[in-house]
A protein has these predicted regions:
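DNA-contacting interfaces and partner/effector-binding or oligomerization modules
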Residues: 117-206
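N-terminal low-complexity or simple alpha-helical regulatory segments
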Residues: 1-128
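Extended mid-to-C-terminal alpha-helical interaction segments
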Residues: 177-340
Length: 340
């Protein structure tokens, strides 16, 4: 695990296109803002270029301050295009139906966005389906716009596929109603268990007038190849490091038994395989926590108590003791030295 640093995540620089367009629609030039964060036009032209989630959140927050619009995330979603999601988005644009477009955006999400906290999902039942975005709590001025832009962006993108408006039956958002709550659709509920939008079967069944079967199949093959390349895992330790991300939350640390259950193998088998790789579950857990803690402290404004909660520590004090053991300095000292 020491050679495989755990990161918060990253996303395609294509997402900057909709952010810039939203800023421009408010009468502001986005170029100085993007240059301030190292996003020169030449960087945005690079195929496959990615942007760290922490930097994206800082840019989004700065854009909100620049425009004076706390609901800017909703506007970002409204101007979102499928092409901004790269190969996955272009493939979704060729899907035969809205349903298949939604499934494509979800299945191939790692091609344009990755976060250790989890992955988006699609849940269909007899009455319709939910497109669900994973939790990125705790919420603040730096990340609420991410939820806003993504859910609103999904609706915009699926409407493009259908060639007509695709409305959500219900919009559910995890964080409490913000000051700009009046800017959301009337059917929005806050303080919910998930970030998700509800689509009817009638909308999911809408056909894509631009669908070409052969092009669709070719693009799907390319997506599968790229997904396999991006998600290829060399060791069991790396696989466990990925699983720990979504499990590290809520003020409690995940156990070997929980991880073994996720892998669908007995705990003793997992322990034996890790020994064969020359590592232990506790070492992987500590390395994962250390890497994430360093990134949170360096790249975000989260309080140490919030970081402790996200990394499964029972208290801020327990987290600070562990961090000093790992890095020989306190979290406060680490943040100060990294920002000088």
């Amino acid at each position: 695990m020491s050679d495989q640093r755990i990161k918060l995540g990253d996303l395609s620089v294509g997402f900057i296109q909709s952010l810039a367009q939203a800023v421009r629609s408010q009468g502001h030039d986005p170029l100085p803002l993007l240059q301030e964060y190292g996003l020169e036009p030449s960087r945005l032209d690079v195929a496959g270029a990615r942007l760290s989630i922490a930097r994206y959140m800082r840019i989004g927050h700065a854009a909100i301050i620049l425009t004076g619009d706390p609901a800017l995330g909703l506007r970002i979603g409204q101007v979102s295009r499928l092409s901004y999601a790269g190969l996955a988005g272009v493939t979704a644009a060729q899907a035969p139906t809205v349903r298949e477009a939604a499934r494509t955006l979800i299945r191939f999400e790692p091609l344009y966005a990755a976060n250790y906290r989890g992955r988006s999902s699609f849940h269909e039942d007899r009455e319709g389906g939910w497109m669900r975005f994973y939790s990125i709590s705790p919420y603040n001025a730096y990340n609420r716009f991410v939820v806003d832009s993504l859910l609103c962006g999904w609706l915009r993108q699926l409407s493009t596929v259908a060639g007509q408006n695709v409305p959500a039956l219900q919009l559910e958002i995890e964080f409490a109603a913000p000051d700009y709550a009046a800017c959301y659709p009337a059917n929005t509920a806050f303080g919910c268990e998930h970030n998700q939008l509800r689509l009817s079967h009638a909308c999911l069944n809408l056909r894509n007038p631009d669908h070409c079967p052969s092009t669709w199949q070719h693009l799907l093959q390319l997506c599968e190849q790229e997904l396999e390349r991006l998600t290829r895992i060399r060791t069991l330790g790396e696989r466990i490091g990925q699983l720990l991300g979504p499990l590290l939350n809520g003020g409690r640390e995940p156990t070997l038994d929980e991880v073994a259950a996720c892998l669908k193998i007995p705990a003793w088998t997992l322990r034996r395989r890790l020994t064969h790789e020359g590592t232990q579950f506790r070492q992987i857990l500590n390395d994962t926590r250390r890497d994430l803690a360093q990134t949170y402290i360096r790249d975000t404004e989260l309080a140490f108590g919030e970081i402790a909660y996200l990394l499964g520590f029972a208290s801020a004090e327990a987290f600070q003791r562990a961090f000093k053991r790992w890095c020989t300095v306190t979290p406060g000292e680490y943040r100060r030295t990294r920002r000088q």
